[in-house]
Curated annotation (Swiss-Prot):
This is Putative phosphatase MPN_264. GO terms for molecular function: magnesium ion binding; phosphatase activity. Keywords: Hydrolase, Magnesium, Metal-binding. The active site is at residue 8. It holds the Pfam family Hydrolase_3. Mg(2+) binds at residues 8, 10, 228-229. Belongs to the HAD-like hydrolase superfamily. Cof family. Its cofactor is Mg(2+). Gene3D superfamilies: 3.30.1240.10, HAD superfamily/HAD-like. Its EC number is 3.1.3.-. The keyword Metal-binding applies. Phosphate binds at residues 9, 44-45, 205, 231. InterPro entries: Cof, HAD-like_sf, HAD-SF_hydro_IIB, HAD_sf.
Length: 281
C-alpha cells in the first residue's frame, strides 16, 4: 500500500543521542525485507552537511540506494543523491528584504538570529541580533561553521532562519509579529517554546514530498510519513498515511492516522513495525 516512506530526523529517526539506534536499524531492515522496492525520503530542518551522513548511513545499512532524494533546511532545498554526491533539484531563498526585516525584529526584542546561507562550504551559518547568545553559540557550538551577520551575507542567499529566545513569552510575541507581517510570503513555524523556524512560503516538507511524487510518478495515496513537530505538518497534510511520534504537539497528532505510544528507545522502531505489519503491502 505504500511506495515511499518520508522520515524526519531529529526527534523521529534519530535517538536522543542523534544516532540511528539498533532497534531502528532492525525495524528498517524488516521493512525493506518485506518490500524491497520501498524508497525512503529524508525531510529535515538540518543543513546539507549534517544530513548527508545519515543518508549515507541508511544506504550503507541496506546495502543499496534506499534514500535517493532528501530535503534540508525545512524543505527549502531538495537534493538527489547521484553516485553518492548530492545534486540540487530546487531551492527557495528568502527575499533579502524580508531577511533584514526579520533580523531587525529579532534584534529589537533581544533574541538570537541564526540563518543558513546557500553556500557549499563553511561558514554556512550566520549569527546575530543578541550578541551574547551569538558569541556563546559560535564559541561552544558551531565554531568554524558560522560567522557573525553582515549585510554582505544577504547576497549569498538565505535558505532558513531560526529565531531563539530564552523567554517563551517573548518568543510568542515575536512569533505573532513575524507571522502577521509575513503570513502570505513566509512559513513561520512555532517549533518549540524557544524556537521559531522561518522559510520561504514554498520551502516546506509538503512541497518537497509532492514534488517527488510528480517526479517519480508516485501517488500521494501510496506514501507514508513519520514526524514529531509542527514543521512536519505540511507533509502530514499531503500523504495518505501519517505517523506522529508520542511526544508530538497535539496539533500534529490531530492530523495523524496513527500516534506512537512509546517514549523509550523503541519510540521510532515501534511505528516502523506498525507500518510493516499493517500497510506495507
Amino acid at each position: 500500500m505504500i511506495d515511499l516512506l518520508g522520515l524526519d530526523l531529529d526527534g523521529t529517526l534519530l535517538s536522543r543521542t542523534r544516532q540511528i539506534n539498533d532497534p531502528t536499524k532492525q525495524a528498517l531492515a524488516n521493512l525493506i525485507q518485506k518490500k524491497p522496492s520501498l524508497k525512503v525520503m529524508i525531510l529535515t530542518g538540518r543543513s546539507l552537511f549534517s544530513t548527508l551522513k545519515y543518508v549515507q548511513e541508511l544506504n550503507e545499512l541496506c546495502k543499496k540506494p534506499l534514500v535517493e532524494y532528501f530535503c534540508c533546511y525545512g524543505g527549502a532545498k531538495l537534493y538527489q543523491l547521484n553516485n553518492n554526491q548530492p545534486q540540487e533539484q530546487y531551492k527557495f531563498l528568502i527575499d533579502s528584504r524580508q531577511v533584514k526585516t526579520v533580523f531587525e525584529i529579532v534584534e529589537q526584542h533581544k533574541g538570537l538570529f541564526l540563518a543558513y546561507l546557500d553556500k557549499p562550504k563553511a561558514p554556512y551559518i550566520i549569527l546575530g541580533a543578541n550578541q551574547f547568545y551569538a558569541w556563546l553559540i559560535k564559541q561552544f557550538w558551531y565554531k568554524q561553521r558560522c560567522e557573525y551577520f553582515k549585510n554582505d551575507h544577504l547576497t549569498d542567499g538565505i535558505l532558513k532562519i531560526n529565531v531563539y529566545f530564552a523567554c517563551p513569552l517573548r518568543l510568542k510575541k515575536v512569533y505573532q509579529i513575524i507571522k502577521r507581517q509575513f503570513q502570505d510570503t513566509l512559513n513561520v513555524v512555532n517549533f518549540s517554546k524557544h524556537l521559531i523556524e522561518i522559510t520561504h512560503k514554498d520551502g516546506n516538507k509538503g512541497y518537497a514530498i509532492e514534488a517527488i511524487a510528480k517526479k517519480q510518478g508516485l501517488s500521494l495515496k501510496r506514501m507514508a510519513v513519520i514526524g514529531d513537530s509542527l514543521n512536519d505538518r505540511s507533509m502530514f497534510e499531503k500523504v495518505q498515511y501519517s505517523f506522529a511520534m508520542s511526544k508530538s504537539p497535539d496539533e500534529l497528532k490531530l492530523l495523524a492516522t496513527e500516534i506512537g505510544t512509546k517514549t523509550n528507545r523503541f519510540r521510532f522502531s515501534s511505528l516502523v513495525d506498525l507500518i510493516t505489519e499493517k500497510i506495507i503491502n
